[in-house]
């Protein structure tokens, strides 16, 4: 009888842990925990490029479980860490240009992780639609350099844009 109760308590504790209901711990379920592990990898790869594109001004961070709460996206929220001011803030405070750079970096980070994890999958082509109009000249140049490195890795990068300065910076283009 006591052995059965011990087993039942262990299973109950395991169930609470897997479902994010264990008292005194982070309130995320097992599925979210696994998603966070993959998301951390994507953010790590994204930050490699974001550092370059933001001129070493900021990186993205996954908010800690204790700061996420149940009203959020269950532990998958991002924040921005400023290397200039040594402070952390919500991603909603990013300017339009900064948001574009962060989104581009995340897309490239995801591509890196998919390629690394899937092995046989190698995205040979990437299209980026707009966003460059929200960048200042320096940020635009840094984004173009990062994309140029991708194109140098035997990938085709297509950019859909109305920004005149961007058209002048790209050697091969299709004008419609």
Regions found by a protein language model. Name each.
Residues 1-4, 8-176:
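Terminal ABC-like ATPase head and other globular end-domains that cap long coiled-coil arms
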